Swiss-Prot record:
GO terms for biological process: mitochondrial translation. Its main location: plastid. PROSITE patterns: RIBOSOMAL_L2. This is Large ribosomal subunit protein uL2c. The gene is rpl2. Pfam families: Ribosomal_L2, Ribosomal_L2_C. HAMAP family: Ribosomal_uL2_B.
């Protein structure tokens, strides 16, 4: 996606970037109102997820993660911005008159055709089961359970790789580096998710972060002892503990949080912490 630098009219725009995108009229039957309640709070109003709150109002775009319109060709009409995710989305017009949103595959442009099914070509944007894909195919929007819809590799720039097929399972390397088994009957979309350079975007000012619903991040060492275990002391003081902790006193920075007896451990061949090139 093309990115442009702002002119230096003001400090807030001096370091910001603008991303080129296609704007279009939104389909009324694909967009819903979204009530954002909580802002990082639980049912008692206590903060459980820090640094969240505020932000501009959003409308939810209904995304088709299932891709269950089999053998019905569709054409990409627009490439749009979605405030609910960092990837762009495409508005698809199908031959049967229906419309739908999908994640924008990298490399596709307005006017391209896509289709989903069991006997479709290996083309960017097409969705088909893993049994019909050759080894080494780059995929995204990957299902974990057949028919449930894509749940893996959906972020901007995400891509998984099909590296083996044996028996009823297929071996895939996920964007995190994890290698795991998934049923060959699960479906995925060919290609990589678009908007690859989103992590290199410069917002230019703090207010742009607040528009996204992100609040300031304050170090615990500069707080008071009542606010954080690292706080207090005279001047610039160390944390005063052997190991760093969370604001609630739990171990942080290196403590494993995954359950040791999780049922899906048997499907993981190589954990993401032990990344090796394949």
């Amino acid at each position: 996606m093309v990115r442009k630098l702002n002119k230096t009219y003001a400090p807030s725009t001096r370091n910001g970037t603008i991303k080129g995108q296609v704007k279009s009229a939104r389909g009324k039957n694909l967009i819903y109102g979204k009530h954002r309640c909580g802002k990082g709070r639980n049912a008692r109003g206590i903060i459980t997820a820090r640094h969240r709150g505020g932000g501009h109002k959003r409308l939810y775009r209904k995304i088709d993660f299932r891709r269950n319109k089999k053998n019905i060709y569709g054409r990409i009409i627009t490439i749009e911005y979605d405030p609910n995710r960092n990837a762009h989305i495409c508005l698809i017009h199908y031959r049967n008159g229906e419309k739908g949103y999908i994640l924008h595959p990298r490399g596709t442009i307005i006017g391209d055709t896509i289709v989903s099914g069991t006997e479709v070509s290996i083309k960017i944007g097409n969705a088909l089961p893993l049994t019909e894909m050759p080894l080494g195919t780059a995929i995204h929007n990957l299902e974990i359970t057949r028919g449930k819809g894509g749940q893996l590799a959906r972020a901007a720039g995400a891509v998984a790789k099909l590296i083996a097929k044996e028996g009823k399972s297929a071996t895939l390397k996920l964007p995190s580096g994890e290698v795991r088994l998934i049923s060959k009957n699960c479906s995925a979309t060919v290609g990589q998710v678009g908007n690859v350079g989103v992590n290199q975007k410069s917002l230019g000012r703090a207010g742009a972060q607040r528009w996204l619903g992100k609040r300031p991040v304050v170090r615990g060492v500069v707080m008071n002892p009542v606010d954080h275990p690292h706080g207090g002391g005279e001047g610039r003081a160390p944390i005063g503990r052997k190991k760093p902790t969370t604001p609630w006193g739990y171990p942080a920075l290196g403590r494993k949080t995954r359950k040791g007896n999780k049922y899906s451990d048997k499907f993981i061949l190589r954990h993401r912490r032990k990344q090796q090139r394949i």
